[in-house]
Amino acid sequence: MTTTALLTDRYELTMLDGLIAAGRHQQPSVFSTFARRLPRGRRYGVTAGTGRLVPMITDFRFDDETVDWLRADHVVSEETAQFLRGFRFSGDVEGYAEGEPYVAGAPLLTVRGPLGECILLETLVLSVLNHDSAIAAAAARMHCAARGRPLIEMGARRTHEQAGVDAARAAWLCGFDATSDLEAGLRHGIPTTGTAAHAFVLAFPTEADAFAAQLRTQGVGTTLLVDTYDIEQGIRSAVRVAGTDLGAIRIDSGPASEGARRARVLLDSLGATSTRIVLTGDLDEFVITELVDAPADAYGVGTQLSTGSGRPTAGLVYKLVETAGRPVAKSSEGKADPGGATRAWRRVVEGRAAEEIVLDGGRAPAGGPGELRPLTVPYLTGGEPAALPTLAGSREHHLRARGELPSDALLVAAGPEALPLLRG
């Protein structure tokens, strides 16, 4: 049996143990996942990872080997062990659609069900959503900064091997065009790309020999890496070997803007006017913004994408907001939360998002200008997964929803949150 049950913190199970002993584990409850505040400098977040999370919740089961280990390690009592042997999440999960932009306080994911079941999901929910939403927010900002120029995700080598796959998924969700990660291509259907690294060039007696070898296997449409030794000489060698129909060159070092300008002038002077310029090497949304007037044709982004561009977590929390029919909330300084289950709507006026409205779960907002769009979609009902959109469908949704945000909110500069949140 495939299980995700131990992708959790020990205290989730010790809390369950205490709830069972107190007879409270079946108490009807609601948990909400939200951000108390957005990461510094961010004006909106992007909901990501829910498509991965749903099957992980259905796989949150405890086989005999797992339960025996929990008993041997003195994590749970025998009574709790028996509960876990038959465990299957039976509640409801709803929330923002994958790819949906959000602001602080928005109920991204709501989990309803018996208290003991819901409490077990905390670590798994936060692990998936915090990582993927952080990557998605960075990717969305980079995509806006690129202004239509293709973006390649290249961050697998800068993070954990599985996180690299998930980062590629989140990046493609938010508009990236391809990934270097083959597992992401296989698992998620993302276009893959890649040609050669500096090691390939260094393996041959001369740069020209390396280019010729690459052309023999990849064809003239390939991208030649021209900065192993000297960029100008690399470009000249690339055109000499490949001819003026060479697909692209890649520059991975030096001042990006000036390097692209010099490369374009040189390529044009050599007759390679259609050869594209791909820039890589420590790019982020700020550098890409500065390159808006540079003659670059595409960007490859690695480290800054796979680490959330300096914001490696979305800062989401998973809090009990209702139990036994009454709202509950923390009130400690700096972490006071509104209690009660809620749902969200977005007001869109003349094609432009105007505000987020969050109300108690049973209420709908009053009328007003424009369209009131419900933001909550079902993910599981009675423990059974709902039909989920494809990743391509979620990508289309994200691009459409992001395009409705105020234009100044899409700039990389810090500023107020993209939308005001009204709570009632």
Can you describe what each PLM-predicted range is?
Residues 1-217, 320-424:
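Ordered alpha/beta subdomains of enzyme catalytic regions
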Residues 199-352:
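Glycine-rich phosphate/ribose-binding loops and adjacent secondary-structure elements
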